[in-house]
Amino acid sequence: MSDNEEIIKVIETLFQAGITKDIAVLRDIHLNDPKFSSFSDLPPYDLKDYQNTIELEELKFVSISDYSYEIKNPKISIFGDSAVVAMELNQKGMLVDTKAYTGEHMEIQGRATFVLVKQPTWKIAHIHLSKING
């Protein structure tokens, strides 16, 4: 498998967790290091570390039913053992409130930038998700 294929597979694994609800894989694809950081397209919008990112991704993916995503126009730039991936990202699903037994359809049209490092496999070192709608 080429580096480009491995990199896209890591990013797809992140979003596939929303479909499969296999959130254990999230710890495998993120760089567990103090240098890790992320910005989300959902609140809270502050800069997050590894642990907060994992917890919020787990919460997001278990709270959204019928989750789907589409990666469009990915641009992968590899610089030795680092890579930058920029893309358009569309996400849909039903945000479920299990206490109130209600659901709200959500759709996020956005952009995403990922920085990955190879140590020895590709891991996500930074995520920046942003909405371009609503």
Q: Could you say what each language-model-derived stretch is?
A:
Residues 30, 89-91, 128-131:
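Short beta-strand segments enriched in hydrophobic/aromatic residues
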Residues 5, 23-78, 88:
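A solvent-exposed, acidic/Ser-Thr-rich amphipathic alpha-helical stretch
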Residues 84, 104-134:
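Short beta-strand edge/turn micro-motifs at domain boundaries
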Residues 3-22:
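Short, aromatic-enriched amphipathic alpha-helices that serve as compact interaction elements
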Residues 46, 93-95, 132-134:
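A short local loop/turn or secondary-structure capping micro-motif enriched for an aromatic residue
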Residues 65-68, 79-83, 102-108:
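A generic structural micro-feature
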Residues 81-97:
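A short hydrophobic beta-strand element
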Residues 63, 92-105:
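Short, cysteine-centered beta-strand-loop-beta hairpins and adjacent loop/turn segments enriched
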